[in-house]
Structures are given as C-alpha cells and as structure tokens.
C-alpha cells in the first residue's frame, strides 16, 4: 500500500549504479536521488541510458538476457536488488506505463480489476468495483467509459487506452509510477490530457518519466536529469536545468546543438 513519505524526501536512490548488456555498458556509475511526491523527468538523446535507468527501478531489466546490474538502488532505503525481495510485490509498489498503450484483450473493467484481483486487494465484489471506479476516475477516464465497462479496452482510442493503462497501474495502489515516453504514440490533444493527469497524480505518487520532448519535461516535471552516453551529466530543478544549466553538454542538448 502507498505509505506517507514527506514531499521532497528521497524515495529512490541510486549509488554507483552500472548496467551491462553483455559486453556493452549502458549505464556508468549513476548517482541519482528521486524525491517523493514529485515528477522527475529523464531526458537525453536516444541510447543515452534513460530508459535503462527507469527499468532498473522495477527490475524490468531482469527480463533482458545478459543484463547485469551492479551498484546500489534503493526504494525507501531497501535494496531493490536484494535476492530475498519479492519482485511481484516490488512491481505492485512501482507501477509502469509503457511507450505504446498496451491494454489487455479484456473488458475495460477487467483491465483495471486484474491487478487488485491477483494481489488480493479487494475483499468482495463491491470493494473491487470501488477500486475500479476510483482508478478510472483518477485516470480521468471514468466519465468517458462508465456506460461501457464491459466493452474491450482495445476498442478505445489511443489516448483513452493510455489512460486505461494508467488506471490499471494505479489500481494496485503503487507508491511510484514509471512512465516510459507515455505520449510518444499520442496526438497533441491526447498528450495534453495525459500531461494534465500527471500533474494531478503527483499529489499521491512519485512519478519518473522518460521523455524525448524537452517541452513536455518542462511542463510536467519539478526535477530533470540529463543523461548522455550512459552517464548522468546533470540533475536539478527543472526550471534551473532549462534556463541555467551548469554543464556545457546540458546546454548543448537543451539548445538543440545535438540530439
């Protein structure tokens, strides 16, 4: 269940984090703190390591052949890579929304109910109904689908599908939501709705978002971390990063000299 962590307190901490895929090193000695109750944007050119870092947080890299993670990564001070840790429970605490909307081939209702069912979060049907409705409401989708919950989630528009995936993620009461370029496949109107939703969700969740759009990072985040060639170049308040970066590489990326 979600637990209270004072806003701004470090929720996730990486120290000396390295990731190898076989012989290739994807992350080099990353030290990064993710504050609770804020949106942290990870930016940088393609292949810079931002998605690799994101996937370390809920151990999605475990599913990649040849992946090796060294160093320290903690969630509320507990080692994410402790061998005794239940990865299923970790992924309940740390939800994920992917680049392309991926609703299950189930009804809208069952898409959202799936997680609470497998984690035993509802004592009865009425409680499950409440979780589903509340999750759809938080995702800004309930008004659009309330009369057709039995219809397939795959029949929704792209933007609605992505908000359904967000509802599915928050239905298990995560503490952290990871978003890997959640708007890259959406049109501008759907993107605006998701961005508005992110702003609303940060009151209750710690959010880490990977984005190729610097404009999006500036709109939705309070902190921004800039990655380049697998290294963390600079991290700070979003306004400071975009208006007064300290590192020449950051300045070059922000101003479009490379990308």
UniProtKB/Swiss-Prot annotation:
Gene3D superfamilies: P-loop containing nucleotide triphosphate hydrolases. Its main location: membrane. It is a peripheral membrane protein. Its EC number is 7.3.2.1. ATP binds at residues 44-51. It catalyses: phosphate(out) + ATP + H2O = ADP + 2 phosphate(in) + H(+). One of its GO terms (molecular function) is ATP binding. Belongs to the ABC transporter superfamily. Phosphate importer (TC 3.A.1.7) family. Part of the ABC transporter complex PstSACB involved in phosphate import. Responsible for energy coupling to the transport system. The complex is composed of two ATP-binding proteins (PstB), two transmembrane proteins (PstC and PstA) and a solute-binding protein (PstS). This is Phosphate import ATP-binding protein PstB 2. It comes from Paramagnetospirillum magneticum (strain ATCC 700264 / AMB-1) (Magnetospirillum magneticum). The gene is pstB2.
């Amino acid at each position: 269940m979600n637990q209270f962590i004072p806003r701004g307190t470090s929720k996730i901490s990486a120290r000396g984090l390295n990731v190898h895929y076989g012989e290739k090193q994807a992350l080099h000695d990353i030290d990064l703190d993710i504050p609770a109750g804020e949106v942290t944007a990870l930016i940088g050119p393609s292949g810079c390591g931002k998605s690799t870092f994101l996937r370390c947080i809920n151990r999605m890299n475990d599913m990649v052949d040849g992946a090796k993670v060294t160093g320290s990564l903690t969630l509320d001070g507990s080692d994410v890579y402790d061998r005794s840790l239940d990865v299923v429970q970790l992924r309940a605490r740390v939800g994920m929304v992917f680049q392309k909307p991926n609703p299950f081939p189930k009804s809208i209702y069952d898409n959202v109910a799936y997680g609470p069912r497998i984690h035993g979060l509802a004592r009865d049907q009425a409680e499950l109904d409440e979780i589903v409705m509340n999750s759809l409401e938080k995702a800004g989708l309930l008004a659009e689908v309330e009369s057709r919950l039995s219809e397939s989630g795959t029949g929704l528009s792209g933007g609605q599908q992505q908000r359904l995936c967000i509802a599915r993620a928050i239905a298990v009461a995560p503490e952290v939501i990871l978003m890997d370029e959640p708007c890259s496949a959406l049109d501008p109107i759907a993107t605006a709705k998701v961005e508005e939703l992110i702003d609303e969700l940060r009151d209750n969740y710690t959010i880490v978002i990977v984005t190729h759009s610097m404009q999006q990072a500036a709109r939705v985040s309070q902190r921004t971390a800039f990655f380049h060639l697998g290294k963390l170049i600079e991290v700070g308040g979003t306004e400071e990063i975009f208006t007064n970066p300290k590192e020449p590489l950051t300045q070059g990326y922000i101003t479009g000299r490379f990308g």
